[in-house]
């Protein structure tokens, strides 16, 4: 009877845990947070604004902890591409290629050279137009990455049978600012942050069920929120704040003035700075 009880207990503990994947997942579009849904459902502007983004730098100086790697950075280095995507998806801005500007200029030189010597392809016979200049620039950087901001857990064990769970919160912070190309004036600036959740669940048994017979078993899993998705969410939130702030300060306007009370705009307008925990 005692052996049966132990066996049932182990099965119950293991039943609460997810089974390991049996095959690799198929390629899919990147999952997105609630901030992306808010970004893509903003009310329409009076007109889209040409914007350029050059480089969003990682100013944290943080590297992944040992034993992962001493040379891999703790945060993704793709913040520029994320910001360009967020600006375009908002339907408020028309991003202009600036990160790969040298590649674009080289390609235009090749086309012009082919046009001059008469070997140009049919699709490039029309003279090239001048590149479009931006009305504003969006600058910024990843200004902070703090690991183990908060951690904790809970567990219980009875006669060698038990389970426990632990969690850890990291935090990433981003600064975005809008710059007037004509004057260099910083029109708007915002700091946003996003927590990164990691947790672990374990269960096990360590019990002598008979003389010289030991029952031992462990099951568990860990889940780490991708830093890439958290950075993307922080950038999307920052773009929404910049749009909202620009509306309030008259930098740009809505196509329909009545939509100033749009649910998304109101939510972010009333979002206050959280107190220190």
Swiss-Prot record:
Lipidation (N-palmitoyl cysteine): 16
Function summary: May be involved in the biogenesis of curli organelles.
Lipidation positions, renumbered (S-diacylglycerol cysteine): 16
An annotated Gene Ontology molecular function: identical protein binding
The organism's taxonomic lineage, starting at the top: Bacteria, Pseudomonadati, Pseudomonadota, Gammaproteobacteria, Enterobacterales
Record-given protein name: Curli production assembly/transport component CsgG
PANTHER family for this protein: CURLI PRODUCTION ASSEMBLY/TRANSPORT COMPONENT CSGG, CURLI PRODUCTION ASSEMBLY_TRANSPORT COMPONENT CSGG
Organism: Escherichia coli (strain K12)
Repeat as UniProt keyword: no
Location of the protein in the cell: Cell membrane
GN (gene name): csgG
Family under the similarity heading: Belongs to the CsgG family.
Pfam families: CsgG
UniProt keyword terms in alphabetical order: Cell membrane, Lipoprotein, Membrane, Palmitate, Signal
Stretches assigned to coiled coil: none
Any single GO CC term annotated in Swiss-Prot or TrEMBL for this entry: outer membrane-bounded periplasmic space
Any one biological process term the GO annotation gives: single-species biofilm formation
Position of the signal peptide: 1-15
Bilayer topology: Lipid-anchor
